[in-house]
């Protein structure tokens, strides 16, 4: 179907029209463990949430989402918060970086096989509040705090991390999306709050059009040509969709928050956890957008 296309049924005397649903967030079932500064991987119907700060201490708690409910599974080997993660499903993910306190940064990397986390080779640069993209065998880690802001980018080939070309704008508390380590998008972050967006082609970062709303500690979902950015600080529900060229503001999260986790695509995303003054939340929301059909009759 094409947006704007209309069909008329001469038998039922009804008209159908195809249109693009701009999208909306709907409340889903909550996480079991309240936390913020967590990471996510997977898709809306098969997601993984891991790490974070409940508080008072960093956690390794991992939960798997089946499209309806969250179920606690085996913990990360290294408890940490403000880490990054990536992965195509809730059975194959990667966790890297993070901290157990602002003074104790981590470079540990762990891979998830659907049952257990296994420690693999470390990042070269220990850091927290970084972003990630890709899969558990082809990932990208970029930005973050060491604790000062950094532009360092590292590429994961399933065995080792290799430092590659830096971001153009050093920042932390940014978001990242992408299907592989050769095609990624970095957006938002700080300090100060920024709307800067950069796209990665496997070799270099290139600055492209900015987000509409500058913010940090936001989450993302999707790819470098079809992304969704949502949440952030000061706690906001602002959601923007990226079409490969421009950002467009769409429907807000019902629960505005920062330091949240994200997973999925730009038409079917998941937002979970995060921080709303005065503390962490278990709130989960599902994003739905894309082609839709409406039927009209003569009543």
Labelled PLM ranges:
Residues 1-299:
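Polar, enzyme-active/binding microenvironments
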